[in-house]
């Protein structure tokens, strides 16, 4: 599992809600898990702040997980990013997506503290990244989810998802070329034992 925060948050409430559920609330493989879409949209629309909402997702390599785990994860994640707040102080909408070949638990949070009406910033990269990363690592260990920090899953080259296809292919080709250069050739490997055998009678160690 990975935790992603999207670079969004400006504009009206209809944008994120329509994306998650479809304009007519008929998006395929989308399911409302928690919250009231219309209430969330209304809170976003009522905001006078430049960044009106925070959006992101918990993304899993697993195609599905038990329903009780989903709700436990949502509860735990809210406790992590809303530390010190009660549930009546914030609004958080959760929508499940499964249309990309993986499970995503998407969240949208109006950046408003409900009791005071003051600005709420649930995630600030510089201050909160370490805490959220620690939460993610703990959940992956606890539930056995696929872990992006597993060395076996690290790519030899990190590529931006939005690169043009031909650029991605070129980058992959370069990566494969360098990998071959780093690997000892069969000819060189075959020669090494002969050198040792040739030196064996000369007393060299």
Curated annotation (Swiss-Prot):
InterPro entries: Endonuclease_MobA/VirD2. Keywords: Plasmid. It comes from the Bacteria. Residues 142-205 are annotated as: Disordered. Residues 155-174 have a biased composition (Polar residues). Residues 189-205 have a biased composition (Basic residues). Pfam families: Relaxase. Plasmid pJD1 is the smallest of the gonococcal plasmids. Its function is unknown. This is Cryptic plasmid protein C. It comes from Neisseria gonorrhoeae.
């Amino acid at each position: 599992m990975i935790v992603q925060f999207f670079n969004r948050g400006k504009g009206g409430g209809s944008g994120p809600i329509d994306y998650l559920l479809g304009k007519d609330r008929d998006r395929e493989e989308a399911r409302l898990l928690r919250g009231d879409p219309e209430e969330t949209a209304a809170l976003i629309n009522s905001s006078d702040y430049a960044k009106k909402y925070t959006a992101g997702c918990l993304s899993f390599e697993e195609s599905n997980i038990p329903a009780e785990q989903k709700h436990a994860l949502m509860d735990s994640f809210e406790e992590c990013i809303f530390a010190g707040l009660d549930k009546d102080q914030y609004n958080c909408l959760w929508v499940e997506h499964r249309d990309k070949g993986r499970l995503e638990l998407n969240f949208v949070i109006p950046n408003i503290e409900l009791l005071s009406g003051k600005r709420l910033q649930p995630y600030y990269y510089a201050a909160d990244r370490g805490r959220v990363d620690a939460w993610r690592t703990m959940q992956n260990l606890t539930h056995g989810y696929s872990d992006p920090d597993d060395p076996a899953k690290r790519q030899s080259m990190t590529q931006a998802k939005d690169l043009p296809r031909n650029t991605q292919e070129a980058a992959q080709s370069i990566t494969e070329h360098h990998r071959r250069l780093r690997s000892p050739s069969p000819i060189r490997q075959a020669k090494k034992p002969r050198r040792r055998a040739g030196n064996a009678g000369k007393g060299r160690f």
